Curated annotation (Swiss-Prot):
Superkingdom of origin organism: Bacteria
Organism of derivation: Rhodothermus marinus
GO BP field: chaperone cofactor-dependent protein refolding
Name of this chain's protein: Co-chaperonin GroES
Role description: Together with the chaperonin GroEL, plays an essential role in assisting protein folding. The GroEL-GroES system forms a nano-cage that allows encapsulation of the non-native substrate proteins and provides a physical environment optimized to promote and accelerate protein folding. GroES binds to the apical surface of the GroEL ring, thereby capping the opening of the GroEL channel.
Amino acid sequence: MAKVKIKPLSDRVVIKPEPPEEKTESGLYIPDTAKEKPQRGTVIAVGPGRVENGTKIEMSVKEGDKVLYGKYAGTEITIDGEEYLIMRETDILGIIEEEK
């Protein structure tokens, strides 16, 4: 079977959420019922941007960016057993930049 690829439209992005924390900093395991919904992930695909007042607005994020988003942002989808989120770029709160 062919691998499915998602191509988002307009100002939408596809994000692969980071897995939820399995245990606390002190080493206690967190049960599934108490795990926080992830709010960070990696951008997998980016739409072409949107048109506003006749001007094309380019996207601020790109594939591979690590981003923060709201707890209830986006639409959850499952493809080939993998969980993804599709959301508008405006639902992304920020890009995580690692210091070197």
